């Protein structure tokens, strides 16, 4: 049954994307937003990334580090120190908290563990369900989330918020940042609204998610845009399959904030304003798993097979 669910999920993604895939070379500029089955599509021109590259490199290293099985508290990753770790990276995705000189208290979630069945099943539980208003009371009316990701976040949420508040006080730190790869990127996306509601001090400095799958519907994407205050970014590397899944045709929608590295693993990256920008990753039809666990801002994020401890800007 478990294998059937995974196979069915991948088959649906492939079929729908083949039928509806966007052509290459889209040049339309206006209007800025266009309806796609009632959902927003941006035609805004790409821009330079809005922050210094070293910031994204530090985020990438911390996104990689939470995937490492062998680690110890107080390990250094760039300008950050590991403070806390939770989860078995099977039923519960590993969460790690760092104190970074440049980013504040950083929460990083590991990506899907392909060697553990519960981690795979959580990622395959693809149905859209209503947001749990106990955690997300400020989400837009009608907001829905990917069931497996919402369930995974709810398991960690009480511990996460408690430890986050503790380390903010311990380090007298007002900045909070969120990151992760793949499944972990989805949890960083979901955490944004919950963290913002529960902060006792400070604010969310940045959220940078790598290899982010679509996590919710149009109303959830709108909620991220509204509450992120322009500080949410997700990075697509080349023809990464995961960033293109689940398909929009199933009701899913990315929020604003895409940074696309194209070609994959290169030093060519641009920021694509608005939701589902046609000039960004949606303009290419392709499915690459190697691009998913690749090099982001000259920093490898390769899950279990990457640098452990993670390195910053050395790839």
UniProtKB/Swiss-Prot annotation:
Gene3D superfamilies: alpha/beta hydrolase. GO terms for cellular component: extracellular region. Keywords: Disulfide bond, Glycoprotein, Hydrolase, Lipid degradation, Lipid metabolism, Metal-binding, Secreted, Signal. Its EC number is 3.1.1.-. It catalyses: a monoacylglycerol + H2O = glycerol + a fatty acid + H(+); a diacylglycerol + H2O = a monoacylglycerol + a fatty acid + H(+). Its main location: secreted. The keyword Hydrolase applies. SUPFAM superfamilies: alpha/beta-Hydrolases. Residues 1-21 form the signal peptide. Disulfide bonds join 68-308. Glycans are attached at residues 74, 265. Belongs to the AB hydrolase superfamily. Lipase family. Class 3 subfamily. Secreted lipase involved in Dandruff and seborrheic dermatitis (D/SD) probably via lipase-mediated breakdown of sebaceous lipids and release of irritating free fatty acids. Shows activity against monoglyceride and diglyceride substrates and generates free oleic acid from the substrates mono- and diolein. Able to cleave the oleic acid from both the 1 and the 2 position of the glycerol backbone as 1,2 isomers of diolein were converted into oleic acid and glycerol. This is Secreted mono- and diacylglycerol lipase LIP2. It comes from Malassezia restricta. The gene is LIP2.
């Amino acid at each position: 049954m478990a294998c059937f669910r995974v196979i069915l999920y991948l088959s649906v993604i492939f079929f729908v994307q083949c039928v509806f895939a966007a052509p290459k070379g889209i040049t339309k500029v206006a209007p800025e937003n266009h309806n796609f089955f009632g959902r927003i599509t941006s035609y805004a021109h790409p821009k330079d990334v809005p922050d210094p590259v070293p910031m994204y490199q530090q985020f990438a290293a911390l996104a990689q580090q939470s995937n490492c099985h062998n680690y110890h508290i107080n390990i250094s990753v760039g300008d950050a120190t590991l403070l806390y770790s939770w989860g078995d990276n099977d039923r519960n995705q590993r969460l790690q908290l760092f104190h970074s000189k440049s980013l504040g208290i950083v929460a990083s979630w590991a990506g899907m563990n392909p060697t553990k069945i519960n981690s795979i099943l959580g990622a395959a539980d693809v149905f859209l369900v209503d947001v749990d208003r106990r955690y997300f009371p400020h989400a837009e009316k009608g907001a829905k989330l990917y069931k497996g990701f919402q369930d995974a976040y709810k398991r960690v949420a009480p511990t996460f918020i408690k430890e986050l508040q503790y380390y903010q006080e311990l380090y007298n730190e007002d900045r909070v940042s969120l990151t992760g790869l793949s499944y972990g990127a989805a949890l960083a996306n979901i955490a944004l609204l919950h963290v913002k509601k529960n902060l006792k001090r400070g604010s969310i400095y940045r959220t940078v998610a790598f290899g982010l799958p679509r996590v919710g519907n149009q109303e959830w994407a709108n909620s991220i845009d509204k509450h992120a205050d322009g500080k949410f970014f997700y990075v697509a590397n080349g023809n990464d399959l995961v960033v293109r899944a689940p398909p929009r045709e199933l009701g899913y929608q990315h929020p604003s904030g895409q940074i696309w590295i194209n070609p994959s693993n290169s030093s060519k990256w641009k920021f694509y304003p608005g939701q589902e920008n046609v000039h960004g990753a949606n303009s290419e039809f392709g499915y690459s798993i190697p691009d998913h666990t690749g090099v982001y801002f000259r920093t490898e994020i390769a899950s279990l097979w990457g640098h452990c401890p993670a390195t910053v800007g050395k790839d």
